[in-house]
Swiss-Prot record:
A Gene Ontology molecular function term of the record: NADPH binding
Classification via Pfam families: Thy1
UniProt function note: Catalyzes the reductive methylation of 2'-deoxyuridine-5'-monophosphate (dUMP) to 2'-deoxythymidine-5'-monophosphate (dTMP) while utilizing 5,10-methylenetetrahydrofolate (mTHF) as the methyl donor, and NADPH and FADH(2) as the reductant.
Subunit field text: Homotetramer.
Protein name: Flavin-dependent thymidylate synthase
Top-level taxon of the source organism: Bacteria
Pathway given in the UniProt record: Pyrimidine metabolism; dTTP biosynthesis
EC number: 2.1.1.148
Length: 294
């Protein structure tokens, strides 16, 4: 039977629908469903106009205008649903974005698989001395990184062994020892390390997805969540290319400047030599402003 649809479809997204996109060692992202495209945003903004009533360059210009001026509602007309497999410690950071609908694999009802994340040696670094929430840019020496990986792997395997022992069940749920009594899955799971993988379905509208990507695809974001965001950016580019171009122009590669920062720029344009001491800005504000201008 030939399936037809009257809904808008995006060929580039249809090609990757349901296909797992590998992330990290055992993780993936799959696009499960979506609604809308660039034209849906334009149509919502114009309300009374249907698809195709304006030239493409006018549609693109309108999307640029909407994003540039923070008119968010039209972007909420597009939705996308993902199936994502990710380490638990990243899931806990990810779930802080509360504007999505989420349904996670339940370790109360099912037994988690024996898959855990181990970082590449190049991504193992010490704590940053200036940023309390991230690692330094330089990797640790090879022998130190290897020791770290050995500890992480040993702990994960030992905890999973205890997990099965506590439940008295293997990965498939088969009883290990007929003469022993296991505890409930909802209790046994507490002993697993946070680098074990979980899965969830994550549905979100385009506006909130762009907000998520602006934060999580940023160079300051943790590497392990940033790589997921970078894959999602590629998906957004395939799904809504006009929106992606505007997002890249005004959010990813653009910059917000404070009133004081704008005043500094005006003074510099007028030929004044402005320093941190004469800028009325904090040291951090000044450094961030100077970074914008290279």
């Amino acid at each position: 039977m030939h399936n037809t649809t009257k809904r808008v479809t995006v060929p580039a997204l249809e090609e990757i629908l349901y296909e797992p996109i590998k992330v990290l060692d055992y993780g993936f992202i799959r696009v499960i469903d979506y609604m809308g495209d660039d034209s849906a945003i334009v149509q919502a903004a114009r309300v009374s106009y249907g698809k195709g009533t304006k030239q493409l360059n006018q549609d693109k210009g309108l999307i640029n205008y909407l994003l540039r001026h923070y008119h968010t509602t039209p972007f909420e007309m597009c939705d996308i649903k993902f199936h994502i497999k990710l380490p638990i410690f990243i899931a806990r950071q990810w779930i802080r974005h509360r504007t999505a609908s989420v349904n996670e694999y339940s370790a109360r009802y099912s037994i988690l698989g024996n898959e855990f994340y181990l970082p590449e040696p190049a991504n193992i670094a010490s704590q940053s001395a200036v940023n309390k929430q991230c690692r330094e840019g330089d990797s640790l020496p090879k022998e130190v990184a290897e020791k770290v990986l050995a500890i992480l792997e040993e702990d994960a395997r030992q905890c999973y062994g205890h997990y099965k022992e506590l439940m008295n069940a293997d990965e498939e749920g088969n009883i290990i020892d007929e003469n022993a009594t296991g505890i409930a899955r909802e209790l046994a799971r507490m002993n697993l390390t946070l680098n074990y993988y979980t899965e969830w379905y994550w549905k979100i509208n385009l506006h909130n997805l762009l907000h998520f990507l602006r934060l999580r695809a940023d160079p300051h974001a943790q590497y392990e969540i940033r790589v997921y965001a970078e894959k999602m950016l590629e998906i957004v580019k395939a799904w809504v290319p006009f929106v992606y171009e505007a997002f890249e122009e005004y959010r990813l590669q653009g910059a917000n400047i404070s009133r004081k920062g704008l005043d500094v720029i005006k003074r510099m344009i007028n030929g004044e030599k402005v320093t941190h001491e004469t800028s009325d800005m904090t040291k951090r504000e000044w450094e961030e402003l100077m970074k914008i201008f290279g």
